[in-house]
Amino acid sequence: VADCVVEIWQADAGGIYNSPAEHRGKADPNFIGWGRFPADESGRLSFETIKPGAVPGPKGTMMAPHLTLWIVARGINVGLMTRMYFSDEEAANAKDGILSKARMTGRDKTLIGKREGDTVNFDIYLQGENETVFLDV
């Protein structure tokens, strides 16, 4: 989407969020944990960050390392929320609750960023056969 803005939230490398609600420890003071990025005219954007650690999920489970993304743009009445998981975290991804639910419908691949060297590529599709899984939060 050419005129979209994507906001990204994530834990630090140790799986700790830089948030007043975080009670598991002190987050890396050199890492903010979020950013907001506009897409260019072709709908592409890029940013530099660290790979987050796994974070606790419901009922004592662990969520695989991921970025949470919120997409807003003209024509989208409510921001869309999704996640990007990492292709090199196969064991953690196999245990993640959201990925497990998406796997039941064969749509888990829409949530996996593909590592290529030091870069992870992730395409977000708003509709169609490859539509990204969006979370109802």
Listing of model-derived features with the role each one plays in the protein:
Residues 1-137:
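Beta-strand-dominated extracellular/periplasmic modules and repeats
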